[in-house]
Design a protein with these regions (language model features):
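Elongated, mostly alpha-helical coiled-coil "stalk/stator" tethers of large membrane protein machines
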Residues: 1-163
Length: 163
């Protein structure tokens, strides 16, 4: 069984449990925070796969990586994953959960890149325009790239609009 199948199965189970408890939004926030922790701290994956670190220490590290307000469903999921010996797949499970959640919510991740911080009103207007034209809810992420001479770049999944 490959990493993708395992991650998807666990992510589906987590989404099902979270949906049943009506906390899928909170778990989504936890999974996004966890994913950011994996990106920010390259050694996190090494810690999770290190055999000299105990299961309870790994659980504590993952719970800290999910942020201060980690939901009980996420905590239980982390404990379950560690008990099943699948902790090395946690990053992929977090990514798959996000993907499944967005699909369920009919949401697309859109990245808005500009040379300077754009006013919130303009960001909202751009997000509304995308929602209207794409037929999806938009999760807008912003990036600042001073190398852009003017205008902005909008990345909607696999499409790019350079304006």
């Amino acid at each position: 069984m490959n990493h993708g199948k395992i991650s998807i199965r666990y992510a589906k189970a987590l989404l099902g449990s979270a949906t049943e408890s009506k906390v899928e939004d909170k778990v989504y926030t936890d999974m996004c925070t966890l994913e950011q922790s994996f990106k920010q701290f390259a050694t996190l994956q090494q810690v999770l796969t290190n055999p000299s670190i105990t299961a309870s220490e790994k659980a504590n590290v993952l719970k800290l990586a999910c942020g201060k307000n980690i939901h009980a469903t996420t905590q239980a999921f982390i404990d379950f994953v560690i008990k099943q010996g699948r902790v090395s797949q946690m990053q992929w499970m977090a990514l798959m959960y996000q993907e499944l959640y967005r699909k369920k919510q009919n949401t697309v991740v859109t990245t808005l890149t500009s040379a300077i911080e754009l006013p919130a009103a303009l960001q909202k207007k751009i997000a509304s325009w995308i929602e209207k034209n794409q037929g999806h809810k938009v999760e807008l992420r912003t990036e600042i790239n001073p190398d852009i001479i003017g205008g902005y770049i909008i990345d909607i999944e696999n499409n790019r609009l350079d304006a």
